Amino acid sequence: MNQSSIQSLTGYDLWQAGIQLFDYRQAANPIRAGLTEPIPLHQWSPELHASGPTAILPLDLSEQLGCPGPATSPALAAHFLRLLAGEGIKPSANATSSLFYVLSGSGQLLRPAIPGDSALELSWSSGDLFVLPAGPDPLLQAKTESILYWVHDGPLLTYLGVEANQPRFQASHYPSERLEAELQNLLADPSSARSNRLSILLAHEDLSASRTVTHTLWAMLGLVPDGASQPPHRHQSVALDLIVDCDPGCYTLVGKELDSDGRIRDAERIDWQAGGAFITPPGLWHGHVNESGRMARLLPIQDAGLHTYLRSLDIRFSGSNV
C-alpha cells in the first residue's frame, strides 16, 4: 500500500464524514413513526387465497416497516401459497428457517440433495406442518388444490447482510394425526380446565434448550374452547397468527396496558376469519376470546426461537394460570 492510499484511509473526511451525536434524552427510544417504524396491527382475509392461479401471496408490510420486502415483521416473512391440482411451485428465500403449514389439500415436497446430505421427499396433507433448514429451494407439487402458510426468517438475514449457507437443524415433519392426538390428550387432562393455554408447542430434540421448532422460529398449535376468555399475556417476540379453524364470534383483544383488574385497557378487537391471518406486535397485551359456540384453532408463529437465545423473550401473564 503506497503513502497516498494510507492517507486516504486515515483521512478526516473518510472516518468522520458520516458520524452523528445525539442527546440521549431525545434519542434513547428510536422506535417511533419516522424513525424505526413500530410494527403495526394488521389482518389478512382468507379471500386473499380463495381463488386465482397457482401463486405465492406475500403478507407484506415492508413499506410500513421501512425495510426491504417482502417482510411481515422486521425478522420474518409470511405468505400464503395457493396451488392448483397438478401444479407445482418453488418457494425461494435466503433464509435459515422455513415453516410450512398445510391449511388444505395434499401434495408432495421434493428438494435436491446437497453435499453431505441426501435429497428430501415428503408427502403432505391437510393439517401437516413441516420445517426446512437452509438449502436448495423445495418443489411443492399439489395433488389436490392446496393452501399452505409459509413463514421464514429471510428479512432478518437481509438486515444482517448474510447468506444462509449452513443447515442449522434437521428437516422435520409434524403429521396432522400426531398433532391431533396430542391435542386430544391435552383436552382429556383434568388439569387443562384450570389452564390459561390449551396448546402444544412444536419442538425438536436438537433444540432442547429453547424448545422451539427451529433455532429462530417458534410454533404453537392452540385450541380456544367455546366460552373461553383467556387472561391477557404479552411477549417481546412478534406473532404471525394463522386462524386454522373458527366460526364467527372468535376474536383477539390487543392493547398496551392492563387496568387494575388485569383486563386490557382501550383494547382493539381483531375478529377472526377461518383461513385468515393477523399480526400481534411485540410487547402488546393480548388475549383470545371464543363466543362462537364451537372450538376454534390457532397457529401462532413467532421469532421466539431467536428471542429465547438472546434472553429477550420476556413473556408475562396477567394472572397466575398458564
Where do the model's predicted regions map?
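C-terminal functional regions that serve as terminal interaction/effector modules
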Residues: 2-42, 238-322
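A short beta-strand-loop-beta hairpin characteristic of the jelly-roll/cupin
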Residues: 84, 88-126, 243-274
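Conserved metal-binding segment of the jelly-roll/cupin
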Residues: 84, 103, 121-144, 151-154, ...
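A short, N-terminal "cap"/entry segment at the start of jelly-roll beta-barrel domains
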Residues: 1-73, 161-221, 231, 322
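Double-stranded beta-helix
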Residues: 2-5, 143-189, 291-322
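Conserved short histidine dyad/triad with adjacent acidic residue
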Residues: 56-67, 76-94, 218-238, 284
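Short, low-complexity cationic-aromatic patches
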Residues: 12, 69-73, 86-100, 136-144, ...
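A structural feature that tracks compact, well-ordered secondary-structure segments
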Residues: 78-81, 108, 151-152, 219-222, ...
